[in-house]
């Protein structure tokens, strides 16, 4: 009978050892550039792929607006987060988030759009106008575009409308003369909005958004997630997942890959000196 007891104990221990590394679901947060519903539809297939590949349960998260997303990053509420280059530089320093991956063959560029019938033809024409932006700390859509206007000594009144979608809609409806955005979100905006807009200006390229992990995530778990992203990048049968988020693949990344953004002198969310 003793051997039966030992066998039962060994079976129990084997079962415990077979439990997933992450019994509690991981959170995969995406910076709120569009409506939560649209983002969930776009990103859930990627999250499902990573979850199935790693065996980790992963829940999609976003926030009602960019300031809330920033507050959650500051508090370390997300295990994995897709964040803009500015956020990564700030929260790598302040909260310890670590770079894991980024989009392959990609640089991020800010752009300014106007209504297609607008008389505005040059940046100088924006002098004295109201310009819509998603949020104060939106890297390409706000920081890069507004920095360029200031560099050219063009005075303008910034208005923050919480999302990229809201920027495009506000310009399309004539609420503001121009708005800041990025190519990907402009291309994915509704046709009836996009077709009414014209790109006035586009910036040079910077290292794109980061997929970063919480500083407390185990190295083995980071590697498993990275392996999933790299596997997806080479799985032609799943290319539709990447196409859904506008990516052509992922590459492994290090914190230093965002040194071009650090060179801009951005120190904090409250004082972007650009």
Feature annotation, model-predicted:
Residues 18-20:
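N-terminal signal peptide c-region/cleavage motif recognized by signal peptidases
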């Amino acid at each position: 009978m003793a051997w039966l007891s030992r066998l039962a104990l060994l079976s129990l221990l084997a079962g415990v050892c077979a439990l997933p590394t992450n019994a509690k679901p991981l959170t995969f947060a995406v910076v709120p550039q569009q409506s939560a519903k649209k983002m969930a539809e776009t990103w859930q297939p990627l999250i499902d792929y990573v979850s199935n590949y790693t065996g980790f349960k992963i829940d999609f998260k976003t926030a009602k607006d960019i300031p809330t997303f920033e507050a959650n990053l500051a508090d370390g509420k997300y295990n994995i987060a897709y964040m803009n280059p500015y956020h990564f530089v700030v929260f790598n320093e302040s909260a310890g988030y670590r770079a894991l991956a980024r989009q392959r063959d990609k640089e991020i560029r800010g752009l300014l759009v106007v209504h297609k019938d607008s008389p505005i033809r040059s940046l100088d024409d924006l002098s004295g106008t109201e310009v819509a932006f998603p949020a104060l700390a939106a890297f390409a859509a706000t920081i890069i575009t507004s920095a360029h206007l200031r560099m050219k000594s063009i005075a303008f009144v910034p208005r923050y409308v919480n999302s990229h979608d809201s920027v495009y809609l506000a310009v399309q409806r004539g609420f503001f003369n121009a708005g800041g955005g990025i190519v990907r979100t402009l291309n994915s905006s509704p046709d009836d909005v996009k077709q009414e807009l014209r790109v006035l200006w586009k910036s040079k390229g910077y290292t794109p958004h980061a997929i970063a992990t919480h500083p407390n995530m185990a190295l083995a778990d980071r590697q498993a997630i990275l392996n999933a992203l790299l596997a997806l990048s080479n799985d032609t049968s799943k290319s539709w997942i990447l196409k859904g988020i506008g990516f052509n693949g992922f590459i492994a990344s290090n914190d230093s890959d965002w040194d071009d953004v650090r060179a801009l002198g951005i120190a904090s969310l409250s004082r972007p000196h650009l």
